[in-house]
Curated annotation (Swiss-Prot):
Any one annotated GO CC term: cytosol
Protein's UniProt name: Probable GTP-binding protein EngB
Domain of life the protein comes from: Bacteria
Binding of Mg(2+), residues: S39, T61
Described purpose of this protein according to its UniProt entry: Necessary for normal cell division and for the maintenance of normal septation.
Signal peptide annotation: none
Length: 195
């Protein structure tokens, strides 16, 4: 499959199942903690500066944003989890919305689960990974912000993340930086394998 990343539009921001796009294009969901670099990851893969809005304010994405890529594929930006300044009720609402999408959407081919390479995975990161494994949803685990860690320490950080998450070696693990595009090719290769 050849994808022209210049042909991009936002299809819809959906709050529930009835708003999901009705076509049968494959979908790749992107999930991670607030401020893990999800928007930067999307923008880097699509060679755009501000297609997915980056924000210094965590918790900005509150709906499922469906990005149409070349009329062939949707990236689905999932609300960032683990953000404290959102009410418990709001977090529960997001949780239900995310769970409904991940467990019922037939178009979903894989989830890019993003973690920050600098830190041990959070409780939320572990829960998301376990959830995806439980439902047999293919996972591409992406460790972001690699430019913030000396290259010589990448292996150590990778080991810490994999151990904490009880990483399944059949999943992809990609070290990524939106600053210098480390992992750009590997990320696209992993995504295209699921389409």
């Amino acid at each position: 499959m050849t994808i022209n990343t210049n042909n991009l539009t936002i299809t819809i921001s959906a709050a529930s199942k009835k708003q999901y796009p009705e076509n049968d294009w494959p979908e790749i969901a992107l999930a991670g903690r607030s401020n893990v670099g999800k928007s930067s990851f999307i923008n880097t893969l699509l060679n755009r500066k501000n297609f997915a809005r980056t924000s210094g304010q965590p918790g900005k994405t509150q709906l499922l944003n469906f990005y149409n890529i070349d009329d062939q594929l949707h990236f689905v930006d999932v609300p960032g989890y683990g953000y404290a300044r959102v009410s418990k009720k709001e977090r529960e609402k997001w949780g239900k919305m995310i769970e409904e999408y991940l467990t019922t959407r037939e178009n979903l081919k894989a989830v890019v689960s993003l973690v920050d390479i600098r830190h041990e995975p959070s409780e939320d990161d572990l829960m998301m990974y376990e959830f995806l494994k439980y439902y047999h949803i293919p996972v591409i685990l992406v460790a972001t912000k690699a430019d913030k860690v000396p290259r010589g320490k990448w292996n150590k950080h990778e080991s810490i993340i994999k151990k904490a998450m009880k990483f399944d070696s059949t999943d992809d693990f990609i070290i990524f930086s939106s600053t210098d595009k480390t992992g750009f090719e590997e990320a696209w290769e992993a995504i295209l394998r699921y389409l």
